[in-house]
Amino acid sequence: MDSPRLTLRSDDLIGVVLPAEGAVLSSLTWRGVSLLARTPWAESPRDIGRAATSEDEWVSRWRGGWQLCAPSTGQPSAAAPWFHGEASLTPWQVTELGPTRVRLAWHSADSAIVIDRSWELIDGCAVEATTTVTNGGAASRPVQLAEHLILGSAFVTSALESGEGVSLTLPPATFSALDYAGLPTTATPHRDETWQHLTRDTPAVVSALVDPQVCSVSAHSPELTATITWSGLDHALLWAELGASVDPPWNGEVMALGIEPTTTPHGAGIGGGGGIDLGPGQTLSTTTRLLCTPAEGRP
């Protein structure tokens, strides 16, 4: 199904934004290498432009890429009935557009929460998402944000097919164990032995980096390094789905590596706590950047 596309270019870096589908950065290509995940059903998602009340609905509308989950994240609840937040799939309004930058706006159905977000390609090698959330209502509101930044495509698949895999450089942080739905669990958390080197044998797994000392994670493939840095978000979720899940809709075909800065170190949603209480007129501002550099020894 077609959706209006905005193409941004900065030298060797090309990004495509879909305003009608959560303002998602649906693809990012650097020097001919596609970096962001793309689902097998990306050409025929269901009911695009609508928020989802369940994980199954959300996944069926997800083409892949990088989008903002807001003003809630993770599982739905009575206070926030949308999986991954109402803004993650619904249309945004374009307010500014140039060759390397687009600015967009979104407001909640009750107009209480207003989000201003921009995508900008920088120096032919970086993309930056800058976001400001404002509570325009008369009462305080709990807010959760997550950058649903999912690497995949050639960046991941070529590394897996070569046998070298993808390695991660992680900051010092507390690791928190989560189940595959993102819910906290008493299991021993996966630490460096799982996340430092990812291959076809890596199980489907989710972990949280709680209060990292440095807000930076690098993913290394044989061709390039993608370094994600962020500010205004205290934690990050890590998600690996490298063909390990064989049940529908994954069918062993989805290659996704999530590095997801977030306000909240779990996927339990507003009902699970961990949101930021925004009073009337208060704002929350965040910045997340993905920088592409050649792998060591590459020009």
Regions found by a protein language model. Name each.
Residues 150-233:
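Active-site/ligand-binding surface loops and adjacent short beta/alpha elements
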Residues 49-91, 281:
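Extended, compositionally biased flexible segments
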